[in-house]
């Protein structure tokens, strides 16, 4: 009888553990689905089609149109605004964190939704002025039309341009305010503009060229002098020989 009770308790315990594991797997799957479908940013893709689609902007809590290239997208890609809202309406930046806390009672290692990059975020990283603020605007090979801003070091201001959606650089900002916050007055040392760099490079090239020409002239002068010295030695040696022959003739 005691063995039967222990067997039943063991089965009940196994059933409870299996139920908890299944519940945890379902919650984790739901978190991942919400993150991939609503939490990530839009991806235009590398292809060059122009397909109108919708994506959920978790920061604004709204569905917004974009142009999809046709390949290598992600789950945050919907054919209509209604489909986007049905899937993601009400999802916020803290949704996945709240779900993780409810499951574990504390912060978990589930991927968090990326937030907008601010000036404080960049200051916490190793800020590379020449990487984030110096390069010229790059539209890229893709054919989307995203309004962006880049920092012009020669004008010390942010200028708007159209970003194609792929293969850009880090000097590309969503707003003029973000661009100015990141780059205006942030250089940590006297900065050389591209024009000044070109002048310096040309000057260095001319200095090296003059140095090489001067060295060549010195070597040429030395060679000429050596030849002249050898020629003079040859002349004097011939005259001495003639004089010695005359003396020998007189003696005979």
Curated annotation (Swiss-Prot):
A Gene Ontology term for the protein's cellular component: plasma membrane
Extracellular-side positions: 28-197
GO molecular function term, any single one: serine-type endopeptidase inhibitor activity
Residues spanning the membrane: 198-218
InterPro entries per the UniProt record, alphabetical: Kunitz_BPTI, Kunitz_BPTI_sf, Prtase_inh_Kunz-CS
Topology class, membrane: Single-pass type I membrane protein
UniProt site (Reactive bond): 48-49, 143-144
Compartments (UniProt record): Cell membrane; Cytoplasm
Disulfide bridge map: 38-88, 47-71, 63-84, 133-183, 142-166, 158-179
Annotated Gene3D superfamilies: Pancreatic trypsin inhibitor Kunitz domain
Residues of the signal peptide: 1-27
Residue ranges, Cytoplasmic side: 219-252
Gene Ontology biological process terms, A to Z: basement membrane organization; epithelial cell morphogenesis involved in placental branching; establishment or maintenance of cell polarity; negative regulation of cell motility; negative regulation of cell-cell adhesion; neural tube closure
Keywords: Cell membrane, Cytoplasm, Disulfide bond, Glycoprotein, Membrane, Protease inhibitor, Repeat, Serine protease inhibitor, Signal, Transmembrane, Transmembrane helix
Tissue occurrence: Isoform 2 is more predominantly expressed than isoform 1.
Annotated glycosylation sites: 57, 94
Domain BPTI/Kunitz inhibitor: residue ranges: 38-88, 133-183
Free-text comment about domains: This inhibitor contains two inhibitory domains.
Biological role stated in the UniProt entry: Inhibitor of HGFAC. Also inhibits plasmin, and plasma and tissue kallikrein. Inhibits serine protease activity of TMPRSS13. Inhibits serine protease activity of ST14/matriptase in vitro.
Record's subunit section: Interacts with TMPRSS13; the interaction promotes the phosphorylation and cell membrane localization of TMPRSS13.
Listed name of the protein: Kunitz-type protease inhibitor 2
């Amino acid at each position: 009888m005691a063995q039967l009770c222990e067997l039943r308790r063991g089965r009940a315990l196994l059933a409870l553990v299996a139920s908890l594991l299944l519940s945890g797997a379902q919650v984790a799957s739901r978190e991942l689905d919400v993150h991939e479908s609503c939490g990530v940013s839009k991806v235009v893709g590398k292809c060059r089609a122009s397909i109108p689609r919708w994506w959920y902007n978790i920061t604004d809590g709204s569905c917004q149109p974009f142009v999809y290239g046709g390949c290598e997208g992600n789950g945050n890609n919907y054919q209509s605004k209604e489909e986007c809202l049905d899937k993601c309406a009400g999802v916020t930046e803290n949704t996945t964190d709240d779900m993780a806390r409810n499951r574990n009672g504390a912060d978990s290692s589930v991927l968090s939704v990326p937030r907008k990059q601010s000036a404080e975020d960049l200051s916490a990283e190793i800020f590379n002025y020449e990487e984030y603020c110096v390069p010229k605007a790059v539209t890229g090979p893709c054919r989307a039309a995203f309004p962006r801003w880049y920092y012009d070091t020669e004008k010390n201001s942010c200028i708007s341009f159209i970003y194609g959606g792929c293969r850009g650089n880090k000097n590309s900002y969503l707003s003029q305010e973000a661009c100015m916050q990141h780059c205006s007055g942030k250089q940590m040392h006297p900065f050389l503009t591209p024009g000044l760099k070109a002048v310096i490079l040309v000057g260095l090239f001319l200095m090296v060229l003059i140095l090489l020409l001067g060295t060549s002239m010195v070597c040429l002068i030395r060679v000429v002098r050596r030849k002249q010295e050898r020629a003079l030695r040859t002349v004097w040696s011939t005259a001495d020989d003639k004089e010695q022959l005359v003396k020998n003739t007189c003696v005979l």
